[in-house]
Structure formats: C-alpha cells, structure tokens
Amino acid sequence: MATDELATKLSRRLQMEGEGGGETPEQPGLNGAAAAAAGAPDEAAEALGSADCELSAKLLRRADLNQGIGEPQSPSRRVFNPYTEFKEFSRKQIKDMEKMFKQYDAGRDGFIDLMELKLMMEKLGAPQTHLGLKNMIKEVDEDFDSKLSFREFLLIFRKAAAGELQEDSGLCVLARLSEIDVSSEGVKGAKSFFEAKVQAINVSSRFEEEIKAEQEERKKQAEEMKQRKAAFKELQSTFK
C-alpha cells in the first residue's frame, strides 16, 4: 500500500537524521554568505523535523487504521463549530438549544444518555417507552454510541426544520415541545406563541373562504354562459 510505503520511508529518514547527528557535509564552491546560510539551519531543521514527525505519526495512524489496528475518531469527539455547520439556525437559537442540552446532561459528560433522555421527555410531558427512547437516539446516532452528543442533538432540530421527521416520532415531539421554553419565555411567551398559532389558523380559514367564493363565482358565470348559449340557439331556430 502506498500509505505504508510512505510511512516507512519517513520513519527511515527520521532515523538516519538522528544517527547522523544533524551534521551536513561542507560543500565546496560556496561563498561566505551561502556557507553561513548552510551552517545555520537549526531553527529550520527543527521545524522541518517537527513537521516530518507529525506527518509520519498521521500516516502511521492511518496505516494502523487500514490494518484494523486502533480506533477511528468518532464524529461526536470531533471539535465542530455549530454556528458554521448549522447555518440555518441563528446564534440565539443555537444558544437556546445548547442551554437545553446542558440542562438535561445530568452527568456533565457532554452527552445525553438513555436515562437522561427519558427524564427529558418526562419533563416535557411526553414520556416514551424504553424502545421508543432507543429509536429516538438511533435516528441521529451517527457514531453508534447509543447516546446523543450536542451535534447529534442539533441534528434533531435540523431534521425537524426540514420536515424529515415523522409527525408521531419521539424526536418530532421533542422538537415541537421544546419550541416554548416556559422557564425563559414565561406565560407571556407562551401566550404570544398560541396567539400566533390562532392567527395563522384564521388566515388559513380566510384563504379557504376566498377560494370557495372564487369557485362559486366561476360556477355562476359558467351557468350564465350556458343559459345565454341556450337562448341564442332558441332564437336562431325561430328564424329557420
């Protein structure tokens, strides 16, 4: 494999440099300035050696992973920036989601496990069965560790916003119930939310009424046109 060969070459090169003590043979024909530059490579050599070591370590780790040695880094352990990865949400929305995540992360380990999710759903007023909780985690569990990282928690709201969750699924219920955080929004926030819902329903009803009125008007016009045609034909027949 090319990766193994490159890693071997880098390791051998580092070993040879270590045995040689970093000495460089004097090259004939160099003038004074060039000789001075060639004789003072300490910082550059140190930086190059550090970069070589880092690259060698990465290549060796990749070779180990390809051979089934070592464990790959799980997505939940990777550092990510929620503001750049989840651009569809505002900073305030992400902050609210983070606050909710930390509220139910009782173990303070950066994850919401099965029992913590069970407690969350009970406090939201939508208790789930053991199997239901497992299915909730499974739907966004990218690294298959049977618990939710903050990134996976954000995926719930991304899927909900995109309409990718079934209406009766536990994750959809979680996203819907967490729209109103009574502890921060208070009764006023809940009131304004439901008023907005009622207003949206009223607007929808008015829209439906307008459509029905237009349909009735078209029917009336069609009936009048039909009657005029019949009258015209009757008038024509009298002149034959």
Curated annotation (Swiss-Prot):
Annotated positions of the Phosphotyrosine modification: Y83
Modified residues annotated as N6-acetyllysine in this record: K233
Binding site for Ca(2+) 1: D105, D109, E116
SUPFAM superfamilies, sorted: EF-hand (SSF47473)
Binding site for Ca(2+) 2: D141, D143, D145, K147, E152
Top-level taxon in the UniProt lineage: Eukaryota
Record keywords: Acetylation, Calcium, Membrane, Metal-binding, Phosphoprotein, Repeat
Gene3D superfamilies the UniProt entry points to: EF-hand (1.10.238.10)
Localization in the cell: Membrane raft
Gene Ontology cellular component terms for the protein in this record: membrane raft
Annotated signal sequence range: none
One GO MF term attached to the UniProt entry: calcium ion binding
Tissue note: Found in lymphocytes; preferentially expressed in CD8+ cells.
Annotated S-S bridges: none
Disordered: annotated span: 13-38
Subunit structure: Interacts with CASP9; with inactive form.
Function: May regulate B-cell receptor (BCR)-induced immature and primary B-cell apoptosis. Plays a role as negative regulator of the canonical NF-kappa-B-activating branch. Controls spontaneous apoptosis through the regulation of BCL2L1 abundance.
Protein name, as recorded: EF-hand domain-containing protein D2
Gene from which the chain derives: EFHD2
